Design a protein with these regions (language model features):
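Conserved beta-alpha-beta core of the PfkB/ribokinase-like small-molecule kinase fold
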Residues: 132-206, 227-228
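Glycine-rich phosphate/adenosyl-contacting loop at the front of the ribokinase-like
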Residues: 1-70, 74, 92
Length: 310
């Protein structure tokens, strides 16, 4: 069944200025509406490496919801476990500056409680034969608990990402049961009640290693934008992964692609350092295009001996 990805679907509304962006002022520009959401992006990123993930989530019972399912199907994502419900998708509104970075954003989260019933009814079928689980940690607490129970039952690795750290903080204790947690530098500061914005990778790496040990978190990766990423494991192993140098067009989805690449590597036999390198390559490929997911790759390009199923 490949990697199972569990999470929410969003509609991304993105505004780009046509001239110099003026904070607080009126800006002429263009507005785009695309399918988004951390987990939806992750599922499509995995599929774009010619792997065949399964997406477990919700969409609206509207034409837009059908469009989301159809696009995922076209990318060879298994959509059997996507439910269509009223208000099943959230909305993310973002304004970009001239460097392609988000300078303001606001989101409306969907109601994901129907996932609880879905996992109760079909959880065994979903998780029994999967290769690993990629989980959006800020889902309903019961959904996270259910996923971790199934993972323990069937001996599956669980990798977690977050879209709203304020909500995920309420699930902080679950991190001790997560095989690897990926977040950005700002989110790491929230997680450990500190400010890491001024830290360079070398110092961030040392701080992270101390934190995962004291918090009993098995493994954690922190992305640092154009400074790359750092990783640390509870056994003391830690390191730095430099960022790829590319021309920035749109940073949307770069973190999701990094997470997808890291999960792919860890699932199919790579070390944590090698997996982060795959994540770094996928993130770089997203930054230099207007799409919020990576372009098509083949597993062999990342040294993965995984059969491509057409």
């Amino acid at each position: 069944m490949g990697i199972v990805v569990i999470g929410a679907v969003f509609v991304d509304i993105k505004g780009y200025p046509l001239s110099t962006y003026i904070p607080g002022g009126r800006n002429a520009g263009r507005v785009e509406q695309v399918h988004g959401g951390v987990s939806r992006n992750v599922a499509e990123d995995i599929a774009n490496v010619e792997l065949r993930p399964t997406f477990v989530g919700l969409v609206d019972d509207t034409g837009m919801g059908l469009d989301v399912i159809e696009k995922l199907n076209n990318h060879k994502v298994n959509t059997r476990f996507i439910q269509r419900v009223p208000y099943g998708m959230g909305t993310w509104l973002a304004i970009f500056n001239n460097d392609g970075d988000v300078c303001a954003a606001i989101s409306k989260r969907p109601d994901t409680t129907p996932l609880i019933g879905l996992l109760e009814e079909q959880g065994d079928e979903i998780f029994r034969d999967c290769d690993s689980i990629a989980l959006e940690l800020d889902l309903e607490k019961e959904t996270v608990k259910q996923t971790l129970r199934y993972a323990k039952k069937y001996g599956k690795k669980v990798y977690a990402v977050v879209s709203n750290m304020s909500i995920a903080m309420e699930r902080r204790d679950f991190l001790q049961q997560i095989d690897c947690f990926v977040c950005n530098q700002q989110e790491a500061g929230l997680l450990f009640s500190d400010d890491y914005g001024h830290l360079e990778p070398e110092e961030m790496c040392r701080v992270l290693a101390a934190n995962v040990w004291s918090a009993n978190i098995p493994c954690m990766v922190v992305t640092m934008g154009d400074k790359g990423a750092v990783y640390a494991q509870a056994d003391g192993d830690c390191g730095i992964v430099p960022a790829k140098k590319v021309d920035v067009i749109d940073t949307t989805g770069a973190g999701d692609a990094f997470f997808a690449g890291t999960v792919i590597g860890l699932t199919y036999g790579k070390t944590l350092a090698e997996s982060c390198e795959i994540g770094s390559r996928l993130a770089a490929s997203v930054i230099c295009i207007t799409e919020n997911v990576c372009p098509r790759f083949r597993p062999l390009e990342f040294g993965l001996d995984v059969p491509v199923v057409d």
